[in-house]
Amino acid sequence: MIRLHHVAQSRSFRTLWLLEEMGLEYDLKHWNFFDGSMRSPEFLAMSPAGRVPALEVDGRTLFESGAIAQYLCETRPEAGLAPMSGDAERAEFLEWLHFSETIGSLLANLTQHHIVLRDPAMRSETVMRLEAKRLEKCIGAIEAVVSGRDYMLARGFSAADIAVAYGMVIGRYFVDLAKFPAVSAYWERLQAREAFRVAVSKDGEAVIYKQAFYPPPEA
């Protein structure tokens, strides 16, 4: 049995969605960012930094959503969600799969300053503005690709789309996607996928992101 350790509205949504796209049977265990349980010895034994996702699979536990995606795609190639080694699109697939962590780091900083740091004296409006601009630049890079095709790879939908879609799933709270017409259409295509809708239904209660945070504060 595969077991996903998950928090709603987090990077573990990528793994949840990927499992649904692959049609794999799995058990879903929800954790809470705020109750201290992710600092427990039980959780840290699975994910030493105390982060989600953690995935129990094939007799071991993996952490890091990008590594999990690459592992699942390589060990279950019949799902057809990644070009394999030697394929002409393999390098491009890996670029976009891991580009998602550039997006994730920006979203983490924006989340810290807009949501987690509740004392205004601890927040940096400069960081909010700079990170929002950097996020826009990343979404602009996706815009350039999907302006000419439906998905990140010419072959069609892949795990790379699941990875970069985090820029829309969470990024839409910090950047107005209406500025990016091709990305907006791409986001609609992704939301229309049955596996995406099922993953959303299993994600859990929205306790982190409940409103938009753009435009960022002015100097």
Predicted feature residues:
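Acidic/histidine-enriched, glycine/proline-rich intrinsically disordered or flexible terminal extensions
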Residues: 203-219
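Active-site-flanking alpha-helical
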Residues: 73, 167-168, 200
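Conserved beta-strand edge residues that scaffold enzyme active sites
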Residues: 33-34, 160, 204
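GST-like domain detector, emphasizing the conserved glutathione-binding G-site
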Residues: 1-129, 217-218
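Short, hydrophobic secondary-structure boundary micro-motifs
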Residues: 79-84, 106-109, 151-155, 197-202, ...
